Amino acid sequence: GISVPGPMGPSGPRGLPGPPGSPGPQGFQGPPGEPGEPGASGPMGPRGPPGPPGKNGDDGEAGKPGRPGERRGLPGTAGLPGMKGHRGFSGLDGAKGDAGPAGPKGEPGSPGENGAPGQMGPRGLPGERGRPGASGPAGARGNDGATGAAGPPGPTGPAGPPGFPGAVGAKGEAGPQGARGSEGPQGVRGEPGPPGPAGAAGPAGNPGADGQPGAKGANGAPGIAGAPGFPGRGPSGPQGPSGPPGPKGNSGEPGAPGSKGDTGAKGEPGPTGIQGPPGPAGEEGKRGARGEPGPTGLPGPPGERGGPGSRGFPGADGVAGPKERGSPGPAGPKGSPGEAGRPGEAGLPGAKGLTGSPGSPGPDGKTGPPGPAGQDGRPGPPGPPGARGQAGVMGFPGPKGAAGEPGKAGERGVPGPPGAVGPAGKDGEAGAQGPPGPAGPAGERGEQGPAGSPGFQGLPGEQGVPGDLGAPGPSGARGERGFPGERGVQGPPGPAGPRGSNGAPGNDGAKGDAGAPGAPGGLQGMPGERGAAGLPGPKGDRGDAGPKGADGAPGKDGVRGLTGPIGPPGPAGAPGDKGESGPSGPAGPTGARGAPGDRGEPGPPGPAGFAGPPGADGQPGAKGEPGDAGAKGDAGPPGPAGPTGPPGPIGNVGAPGPKGARGSAGPPGATGFPGAAGRVGPPGPSGNAGPPGPPGPVGKEGGKGPRGETGPAGRPGEVGPPGPPGPGEKGSPGADGPAGAPGTPGPQGISGQRGVVGLPGQRGERGFPGLPGPSGEPGKQGPSGSSGERGPPGPVGPPGLAGPPGESGREGSPGAEGSPGRDGSPGPKGPPGAPGAPGAPGPVGPAGKSGDRGETGPAGPAGPAGPAGARGPAGPQGPRGDKGETGEQGDRRGFSGLQGPAGPPGSPGEQGPSGASGPAGPRGPPGSAGSPGKDGLNGLPGPIGPPGPRGRTGDAGPVGPPGPPGPPGPPGPP
């Protein structure tokens, strides 16, 4: 990390610049690590530039069709068996719509190459060492680095064991409603024709989500941090590229939290990096194994119930003539509705009439309320055909079906476009320290940053071992007089040194010049009693050395020594508090339409309604003259089914009808409301730490930096009183006495006041993006979310493209009787048949079993699009199916689906633990020089440290010149 200098201490003498160090050897890059397990999907990064167009893939195989939904109508009375009609022709295959060209998918671009690292600037001279200032408040957290470029995806790891079945996701919103085609002419209803060829495969689903990113490589270990020099006074040089980050030391004991400083001004955004050239295209993946068909889908919503079709009177058996298709006759005038005649007796079946022209569709009738349940009456004679009723009101959705069996996971979809950037996650815990990476080239010295705020007072260090006595240095210039320091505690007297030998008596020297007046001595003593004047005695021996005086005031701070080697890392610090969750990010761009989900199991059929009361038997009426065609009356209630006559002869097969026109597109439906946000899953487990990498080479030593400013002058010590000159010549120097015992440590100085918090510096430029960490292990399956509320019906999607016709299937067995078709146009009136005897009402037969499902018939012409049904309630969430085997890759790629509406932004997930550090990436280009910060305020001087070890006893000084003769003594007593 970047070391923050403490407040400036008093300046010492300016040191000489040292020679620049030689660059260390370049380290080797470690071997690549083993590919990790595929990590869980990380947060979606920003959307990259589109790559060059890719090739279209192959069409996937069409899935098996699901079972048709069941519909239960009201139980009708059993009708007599109807005549078997002629077998109709197979419908012509519908025209295949033009498939829109699939948008080419671009190949991913390769990450841009980083620029060459710049030269490292010269290393600055070591500044004077200041006294430890009080610890400043903790600085505000720096801005997060820019997101690094994603590394190339790692190789696919081996497939893991199948996971536990997870919860089935909620049903997706219905797609936009497709345009309703124009209604074609109504065809003649014939017997079901033979199954036609299988329909063409539908267009391929939308591309799936992007694949998971490969595991990120481990971060390189930060290099060794250089010794921080204090800023010099010279002009700032050009900013070089940032040096490699130093090794992360173990966290120390957490200090007292500082007050939060004011937020600095927001810096200008850095220049945008140059976009790298696109990378090479990846290899084409192998074709996966074919997936198993999905489970049978749920039945669709029941269609609108059509009114009963008109039933013609059976004609007499006639000879089957050649079947010709007549041209449709002109529409007759609209007459007033006639009274309903009594139903006639059932006549003999007549010859099948010619096919009439299709009539225009009538309005939809409304479904009447169900009548009370009556007893089953015997079926009456057939009544006249009623007019087509209007379409009934949409029924209520049936009860929620039981949970379906878990479906097998489908094949992996084509990667979709990148989604929106999610909201900022919470700060994760600090990851394990990665292996040291190769050291980058030395960077130039940056401009002087703003002075930091004073830190808290540090704890006193342990007493160091006294070092060896250094060689005497050159005499420095006399310093300025400092402020008087605090007086230290007097140490114990040292042991007396050995007594020196008596010197030889010297010759009396010449009278010396008068010396300079001495400094004022100590306190004036009380005058003693005057003794008798003695005769001058002989020169005495040199006295013993007196006890050592008290320690002097602290001297001037010395020149700061060279930085020592970096100590071992301290213990790991306590983890920091978890940061608050960031604000939700803006909604991202509209994502691609997801692949259709698996079809669920059909739900149980709804309860049957009550049967209506049977109508009373009518009396046969007299045959009237045929009147004019009446106008279409209001929709009447459905009449009971009449008896069916014997089957007539099978007619010739008619020619196929003309191809219907393609319908026009209807208006799109309204957009549905967004669904509710899902619950946040639990955080995933911590990732394993990567193996430590080899140590990086030592970085080059920086060159000489600008000279630092001279600090304020220190406080000079008090001047001691000069000693009296000793008599006689200089004696030989005595031997060094033993070192005195270290004095007791002085009292703890008063803690200085807390310094003023410095003004915040301007915000620096945005640093280079950090290396992406590896993705953590996949998170555990979260609990299944509660079933969401039923959303409004979504818009109906546009009609899909018609696929190519499939192979012809075998003829299926006859299915259950279909719902009544629309009214056909009345055919030519046949000759009246002889009245048949009314048949006895037969008992209601049991419902027959459903026949075996036939093969898919030929694709018929596209019918008119029905109205969008009401969306059923969401079924219960089923368990998650096992992951299916990867299917073989199709021959060609499907068309791109339409882009769906943007979903609501999800709630921010909890930040997972940081993964192991990836390998060191290439060094980025140097950033532009930041604006210089404002000068910080000087901190208050720190407390006085404990007294140092006792110094050596000095050598005896030279003998001074003889003093002037004293005054004559008083006369002696007589």
Curated annotation (Swiss-Prot):
Sites bearing 4-hydroxyproline, chain numbering: 17, 20, 23, 32, 35, 38, 53, 68, 75, 81, 108, 111, 117, 126, 132, 153, 162, 165, 192, 195, 207, 213, 222, 228, 231, 245, 254, 257, 269, 278, 293, 299, 308, 314, 328, 337, 343, 349, 358, 361, 370, 379, 385, 397, 406, 415, 418, 436, 454, 460, 466, 472, 484, 493, 505, 520, 527, 536, 554, 569, 575, 596, 602, 605, 614, 620, 638, 647, 656, 668, 674, 683, 692, 695, 716, 725, 733, 742, 760, 769, 772, 778, 793, 799, 805, 814, 820, 832, 835, 838, 905, 908, 926, 941, 947, 962, 965, 968, 971, 974
Basic and acidic residues: bias regions: 56-73, 880-894
Expression by tissue: Expressed in bones.
Keyword Glycoprotein: yes
GO CC, one annotated term: extracellular space
Chief subcellular location: secreted
Record's subcellular location: Secreted; Secreted, Extracellular space; Secreted, Extracellular space, Extracellular matrix
Glycosylation, residue list: K84
Positions bearing 5-hydroxylysine: K84, K248, K323, K548, K659, K829, K883
Modified residues (Phosphoserine): S90, S584
Compositionally biased tracts (Low complexity): 1-14, 25-44, 98-114, 132-150, 198-228, 352-378, 387-406, 504-517, 581-595, 608-635, 664-680, 709-718, 730-742, 804-826, 865-879, 908-941
Further information: These protein fragments were extracted from an ancient femur bone collected at Cueva Rosello in Peru.
Family to which the UniProt record says this protein belongs: Belongs to the fibrillar collagen family.
Subunit structure: Trimers of one alpha 2(I) and two alpha 1(I) chains.
Protein name: Collagen alpha-1(I) chain
Species of origin: Scelidodon sp. (strain SLP-2019) (South American ground sloth)
Upper classification of the organism: Eukaryota, Metazoa, Chordata, Craniata, Vertebrata
